[in-house]
């Protein structure tokens, strides 16, 4: 019984069970880390280099909340591009994110969430296949964003399941954004 308890404590501490993101928002499984490294994600704003990013993941927010996303500051109207190949799963507008796009990677392992868009790309539709660098929209400040600080709110999430695919644990995307944003 002591051995079982010890194993359970070790597994729980390692993040093998659900219950929120791993410390620092890192993938819990080595296979996830390897998968994301191999994907060579592109910075999702045209013209922005990885070294230009300011890591806002896990920054403090009001009410003791944490920011589990990356904010990429850019001029309003700058193209927002797909960080990876995938399928546009949802295009929607809501009070928090404003104009948003969700892209699920082809293996359904990760969801890319793009928010505060000023406009959607012409002809963008749900179910559309996109490639790394395809335009999804433009940088804006819709939703709860400061109107004077246009930016892309970019979040990387583990694909949860077929019913709640958008509800997976967040992952800090910064270590995996290795390519300069380059609109196709």
PLM regions and their residue ranges:
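Surface-exposed, glycine-biased beta-strand/turn segments
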Residues: 16-99, 132, 141, 170-184
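Solvent-exposed loop/turn segments at secondary-structure junctions
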Residues: 59-60, 78-79, 93-96, 107-110, ...
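Bacterial N-terminal signal peptides
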Residues: 5-14
């Amino acid at each position: 019984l002591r051995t079982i308890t010890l194993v359970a404590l070790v597994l729980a501490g390692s993040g093998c069970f659900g219950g929120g993101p791993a410390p620092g928002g890192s993938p819990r499984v080595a296979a996830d880390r390897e998968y994301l490294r191999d994907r060579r994600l592109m910075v999702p704003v045209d013209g922005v280099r990885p070294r230009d990013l300011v890591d806002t993941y896990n920054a403090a927010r009001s009410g003791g909340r944490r920011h589990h996303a990356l904010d990429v500051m850019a001029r309003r109207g700058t193209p927002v591009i797909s960080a990876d190949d995938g399928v546009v799963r949802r295009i929607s507008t809501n009070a928090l994110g404003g104009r948003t796009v969700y892209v699920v990677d082809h293996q359904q392992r990760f969801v890319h969430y793009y928010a505060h868009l000023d406009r959607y790309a012409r002809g963008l539709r749900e179910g559309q296949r996109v490639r790394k660098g395809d335009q999804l929209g433009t940088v804006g400040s819709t939703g709860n964003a400061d109107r004077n600080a246009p930016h892309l709110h970019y979040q990387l999430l583990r694909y949860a399941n077929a019913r709640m695919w958008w509800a997976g644990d967040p992952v800090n995307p910064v270590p995996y954004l290795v390519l300069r944003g380059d609109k196709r």
